[in-house]
């Protein structure tokens, strides 16, 4: 059942893709213990705001693909929670219970919800975005505060953060970043991702990453330029750890490796494609 009962244009082919758990955490940080109804209302309100006749909500199930490549992927998160008190554990269980209830409610209302053990929402989003033309989607809005999803930004794909309340689009890209969209992956590979426990090149933060991009180009240009003659310590670190750029690309390049991540999670690609296609082409 398409989401056309709230005054949207008929035959609407726009798509809202929601980073399910990411959006739920706004209620945890706001200390809202019972948020199922608010969650559903927020998702549907955003669909109305962006004139999206289709809603797909995604949940995280870990990442077999990235763990196989790099066993320490997100290992810092386990450290963060290992000393939880019983009360904190109970609070988190309640939070996840509300999230499960919200997922069930969204599914009952006819929206498509997807979760696969061993697969991250990022990969599902990237795969769907990559197939959007094949699925007949006009415009796509990504709902997440995770800037990793900016790797998917295109003329017809934009992101809204429920945390900052800001949009990231092709038109306002320069307001958010000081490099072109096609250099975002290179920037991430150089600087790393602390939140996901992916190290970059030691000594290279955002400013130095931007300088290297301007001087050499993308990550493969930088890799091929190594060893770079320099007295600077961070360049010497780059020379010694240039292979890190290639590993980071495999870990972070959602567009290139989402399908591989899906396969390694044991999710059936044909079944996934059928679910998405049937939902998007379902009767209104």
Regions flagged by a language model, labelled:
Residues 273-284:
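Long, highly charged low-complexity segments enriched in Glu/Asp and Lys/Arg with interspersed Ser/Thr
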Residues 155, 174, 202:
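Conserved, surface-exposed functional patches that form binding/active-site neighborhoods
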Residues 167-177:
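Short, charged, surface-exposed secondary-structure boundary motifs
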Residues 122-131, 178-188:
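Short, motif-level signal for alpha-helix interfacial/capping segments enriched in acidic residues
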Residues 2-139, 149-167, 246-247, 253-270:
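Noncatalytic, basic helical substrate-engagement surface that gates or grips nucleic-acid strands
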Residues 180-183, 190-263:
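Accessory alpha-helical DNA-binding modules that contact the DNA backbone or grooves
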Residues 142:
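Conserved SAM-binding loop
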């Amino acid at each position: 059942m398409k989401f056309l009962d709230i005054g949207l244009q008929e035959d609407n082919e726009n798509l809202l893709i929601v980073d399910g758990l990411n959006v739920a955490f706004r209620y945890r940080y706001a200390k809202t213990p019972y948020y199922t109804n608010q969650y559903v209302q927020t998702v549907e309100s955003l669909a109305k705001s962006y004139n999206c006749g289709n809603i797909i909500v995604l949940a995280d199930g870990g990442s077999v693909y990235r763990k196989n490549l790099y066993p320490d992927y997100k290992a810092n998160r386990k450290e963060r929670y290992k000393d939880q008190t019983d009360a904190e554990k109970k609070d988190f269980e309640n939070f996840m219970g509300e999230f499960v209830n919200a997922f069930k409610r969204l599914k009952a209302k006819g929206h498509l919800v997807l979760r696969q053990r061993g697969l991250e929402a990022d990969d599902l989003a990237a795969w769907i975005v990559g197939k959007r033309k094949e699925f007949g989607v006009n415009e796509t809005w990504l709902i997440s505060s995770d800037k990793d999803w900016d790797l998917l930004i295109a003329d017809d794909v934009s992101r809204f953060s429920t945390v900052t309340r800001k949009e990231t689009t092709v038109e306002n890209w320069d307001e958010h970043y000081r490099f072109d969209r096609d250099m975002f992956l290179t920037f991430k590979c150089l600087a790393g991702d602390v939140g996901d426990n992916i190290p970059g090149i030691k000594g290279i933060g955002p400013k130095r990453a931007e300088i290297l991009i301007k001087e050499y180009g993308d990550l493969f240009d930088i890799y091929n330029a190594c060893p770079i003659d320099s007295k600077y310590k961070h360049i010497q670190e780059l020379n010694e750890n240039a292979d890190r750029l290639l590993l980071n690309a495999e870990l972070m390049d959602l567009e290139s490796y989402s399908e591989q991540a899906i396969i390694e999670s044991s999710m059936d690609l044909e079944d996934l494609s059928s679910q998405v296609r049937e939902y998007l082409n379902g009767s209104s």
